UniProtKB/Swiss-Prot annotation:
Parts forming coiled coils: none
Transmembrane segments: 10-30, 46-66, 73-93, 109-129, 148-168
Family to which this protein belongs: Belongs to the UPF0397 family.
Species this protein is from: Streptococcus pneumoniae serotype 2 (strain D39 / NCTC 7466)
Name listed for the protein in its UniProt record: UPF0397 protein SPD_0432
UniProt GO cellular component terms: plasma membrane
NCBIfam families with a match to the protein in the record: PRK13661.1
InterPro entries: ECF_substrate-spec-like (IPR009825), UPF0397 (IPR022914)
Keywords carried by this UniProt record: Cell membrane, Membrane, Transmembrane, Transmembrane helix
Membrane topology of the entry: Multi-pass membrane protein
Pfam families in the cross-refs: ECF-ribofla_trS (PF07155)
Cell compartments where the protein resides: Cell membrane
Amino acid sequence: MEIKFTIKQVVAVGIGAALFVVIGMINIPTPVPNTSIQLQYAVQALLSIIFGPIIGLLVGLIGHAIKDSLVGYGLWWTWIIASGLFGLVVGLFRKYVRVINGVFDWKDILIFNLIQLLANALVWGVLAPLGDVVIYQEAAEKVFAQGIVAGIANGVSVAIAGTLLLLAYAGTQTRAGSLKKD
């Protein structure tokens, strides 16, 4: 299977990964060690909905790997992969959110937030901590606490910032059937 990317998709990955890194440097601490409220997942969710699951996956993988490299504590692959999977899962359901058609009403907001909340619960509450236990032999109690807090924090930040970004984006799109011939 050969995957070909358009120039627009390559640019989306590059800009998305760069935004992931820059926004990811803003850390709002939580009471759980090594866990903070992260705002970059709202941008990743936006790009996943607009460009699809592969772009969302790449934005998360590349952006998180670069961010981890820059902050100096090394690459934490289980969480890097979880970031990519978040974008993948959200992007898989893009056809249910109509922002590309210029529509993002209460139904779309509800669907988007159900998708992102489930994706956050899956990747941060299950996959990342499970990977930490299996691969890094981390204490299960510690990493599941981190994962649950990260999942809740990311879910709330994407619900707020991601919804606002998608509302703004939908407003820039022409609604289907809105143009009429005079």
